[in-house]
Amino acid sequence: MNSIKNHLMCEEIHKRFNLHPKVREAMESIEREVFVPAPFKHFAYTLNALSMQAQQYISSPLTVAKMTQYLEIDHVDSVLEIGCGSGYQAAVLSQIFRRVFSIERIESLYIEARLRLKTLGLDNVHVKFADGNKGWERYAPYDRILFSACAKNIPQALIDQLEEGGILVAPIQENNEQVIKRFVKQNNALRVQKVLEKCLFVPVVDGVQ
């Protein structure tokens, strides 16, 4: 039954956003309900963002699909996610990338996300409890970096950890609005490749909690 609900959810996403076949397959293979808090299970297959603990949210599946596809997913190996949250975005990425690394700064969310990912047997996802602004130098460089929270700017540490020619996608705070931007690394610096759309994400915060 849940797989049917997940399929129908992906149909609704596809009506609004032309899904890459690999992204659609990834979205259909990961049951969103696993990542949704118990009080909101009946909303798991809607296109709504849903509240979690610590004043955080599990993103809309439409947003997850878009952010995944904005990474330009063909012929890439590794991705670093900043802001693991529920683990849903990392789980979707795991169906496309050979190696997924995700950082979460809130310990309670980190513990729950790691457990969910382990329960699903997603052994190619590695989760770390740390300040995402510092990245994860041990496994760098990464082909792709994805921010699942809104940044005012991109820390130099993350630019350094992105492969030359690699792509970074992030919601960026500009004045009173947020916009999703895709950057490419050229000559050791980030260049805006495309401004994709307006958005609404929780902010990137320094330190751990």
Swiss-Prot record:
**The keyword Transferase belongs to this UniProt entry's keyword annotation:** yes
**InterPro entries found in the cross-reference section:** PCMT, SAM-dependent_MTases_sf
Q: What class of enzyme is it?
A: transferase
Give its localization.
Cytoplasm
List the catalysed reactions.
[protein]-L-isoaspartate + S-adenosyl-L-methionine = [protein]-L-isoaspartate alpha-methyl ester + S-adenosyl-L-homocysteine
- Keyword Transmembrane helix, does the record have it? no
- Gene Ontology process terms (BP): methylation; protein modification process; protein repair
GO CC entries: cytoplasm
Q: Which GO terms describe its molecular function?
A: protein-L-isoaspartate (D-aspartate) O-methyltransferase activity
- CDD domains noted in UniProt: AdoMet_MTases
Q: Which UniProt keywords apply?
A: Cytoplasm, Methyltransferase, S-adenosyl-L-methionine, Transferase
The record's active-site residues are 59
Q: What superkingdom heads the lineage? A: Bacteria
Q: Which PANTHER family match?
A: PROTEIN-L-ISOASPARTATE O-METHYLTRANSFERASE, PROTEIN-L-ISOASPARTATE(D-ASPARTATE) O-METHYLTRANSFERASE
**Known NCBIfam families for this protein?**
pimt (TIGR00080), PRK00312.1 (NF001453)
Q: Which family does it belong to?
A: Belongs to the methyltransferase superfamily. L-isoaspartyl/D-aspartyl protein methyltransferase family.
- Give the record's subunit note: Monomer.
Record's function text: Catalyzes the methyl esterification of L-isoaspartyl residues in peptides and proteins that result from spontaneous decomposition of normal L-aspartyl and L-asparaginyl residues. It plays a role in the repair and/or degradation of damaged proteins.
Record's protein name: Protein-L-isoaspartate O-methyltransferase
Native organism: Helicobacter pylori (strain J99 / ATCC 700824)
Name of the gene: pcm
